[in-house]
Amino acid sequence: MAKLEPDDVVLVAILPELRDLEIARVLGWYRIPLKSAPKMIRVDWIAFYLTAAFGDEKWSIRYLAPVMGYELVSRGELLADDPDHPYADEPYYKVAVGPLVQLTHPIPARRWRRITFLYTTGDKLLAARDVKELTLKRSSANAVR
């Protein structure tokens, strides 16, 4: 199993539905619409920020996975069981992920926060006790690959 290193680049990404967690766990990928994608997809890890759909686990980071690669495909290719979706032809990043790792200490957002994507580092992720502690200072953010 991959080990999170202190200087690894981590993309914190929203996980809107239970189905998305199962896709990551079972099929080994996560989807990001190209039109709302962060500037940098080439990261070492992806950490998942859980939404209200996760009940008692909402608004927290509990899982992460190593990023194995990515490709650009249509939403319809990713979710063939939903061919009539309004965004079926839209381009999405299919981010291949390795096995999910459950954090020893979940990272809650003590106050609700609207998060789509943010970058952090392995050391910040392992030390954080609140999601707000993950944000990189401007000089650190510029140094990220």
Description of each model-found segment:
Residues 2-145:
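Structured alpha/beta reader/binder surfaces that contact nucleic acids or chromatin modification marks
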